[in-house]
Amino acid sequence: MPIIRQYEDATDRFQVVELWRNVFGYETAHNEPNLAISKKISTNDGLFFVAVENTDILGTIMAGYDGHRGWLYSVAVDPNKRLSGLGSSLVHHAEKALADLGCMKINLQLLDTNKATAAFYKSIGYSVEPRLSMGKLITRSV
């Protein structure tokens, strides 16, 4: 099983970007992998993890905590390593890191059309909640 450790920009960025492009695709500029990574590491919160085997990055997870709720983002597993328990290990690692900060509840979002990912999260204890997710892009003119 790969080891899970904190993301290290100098050694990990190229592989993480490639993994995310392979797993997520990306259709919008605000989700561009290099931008997302730069913004995350600028927070310096220690909640960005990678799963590494030898020198290969096989998975990622980012978490966030605002003092009230925790969030999971960018959970990605190399397609050749799916169904190996790696996704569950990444989520549990982030859950522990959030719990260590005092977090009592974790949220996440996914597309309602992504049935396989929804089934994965349900299998590890997450449930659909009666909420409406809303968002707004903030432009430089704000």
Where do the PLM segments sit?
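A conserved beta-turn-beta hairpin within the catalytic core of GNAT-like acetyltransferases
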Residues: 64-73, 82, 129-130
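A short beta-loop-alpha structural element at the N-terminal edge
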Residues: 2-16
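Conserved beta-strand in the GNAT
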Residues: 50, 56-64, 71-76
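Conserved GNAT acetyl-CoA-binding A-motif
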Residues: 98-110
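Conserved acetyl-CoA-binding loop-helix of GNAT-fold acetyltransferases
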Residues: 83-96, 123
